[in-house]
Amino acid sequence: MTDFKMTQDAQGIATLTWDCIGKSMNVMSFEALQQMNALIDQALADEAVKGIILTSGKKDFAAGMDLNVLADLRNASGENPAEGVFNGIQSIHQIFRKIERAGMDAKTNKGGKPIATVLPGTALGIGFELPLATHRIFAADNPKAKIGLPEILVGLFPGAGGTIRLVRKLGAMVAAPFLLEGKTLPPAKAKAAGLIDSVSADPMADARAWVLNATEADLIKPWDQKGYKMPGGTPYHPSGFMTFIGASAMVHGKTKGAYPAAKALLSAVYEGAQVPFEIALKIEARWFTSVLMNP
């Protein structure tokens, strides 16, 4: 089965359409990830491709990760299931980071291709973590759609880079309700909150126009730019310190210490804020593995 298909038009835009066969909602599997990864490699290597758009063949974008995949990953890892889970999460991080860097030179940040996501409807969990790794997110003006990272509500936390990216995008205080409470928003409010970039009646047309006109500067995430400073400050900055103290108190007050996912999430945020982005992803993977192995 093929969950991802790619088409290319005369203007050089490659469109990757996610459409899980036999399912009403897209859910990510490791097989689908490998399919997507191969198509991304193909598009990045093709000189005729000027940019890439990720979208869905269904009314919604995606519901998240197939939780059975995580269980299978743990069970298939033999005597060291934690290592298997960690390596599996790291492989997702590598694919998403490849999308984020999009062929850019590591030193000059030049030579990349614009990659946008078009959300026709709901995007949750890894179905939002994937768009967060792209350069722009365009959503349909669909008030019934929900956008966010609700993993904490099922005893997990965003482990495919969503925790680290959202905190570096919004700052710890602004990101807290989405990460620690699993808050989701319709597209218009998601845009106002800074989760996505555009809401319109025709997001595909907007995405195509952006891809064709994007500059090299448009592709560089803030955390890959020199002099980046986290909104609200890092834990060792005075304002950031108070943010993290407040978040810690909120977690303890709401969970009474009984829910390891919330504590692990906060640890990933705190530790990840103090190190370069690539190392922060490894920290996120380590804490996610800890939660999965010790629910």
Identify the residue ranges that each predicted region occupies:
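Conserved CoA-thioester-binding segment of acyl-CoA-metabolizing enzymes
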Residues: M1-T55, E79
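Intrinsically disordered, low-complexity segments enriched in small/flexible residues
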Residues: I13-W18, F30-I40, V174-A176, L180, ...
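Hydrophobic/aromatic residues within transmembrane alpha-helices
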Residues: L54, D66, L130-P131, A190
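Glycine- (often His-adjacent) and acidic-residue-rich active-site loop
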Residues: S56-I95, A123, L153-G155
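A glycine- and small-aliphatic-rich helix-loop capping segment at beta-alpha/alpha-beta transitions
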Residues: N68-A76, E129, T134-D141, K169
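Glycine-rich beta-to-alpha active-site loop
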Residues: I99-V154, P158, F178
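Hydrophobic, secondary-structure "cap" segments at the distal end of domains
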Residues: G162-M173
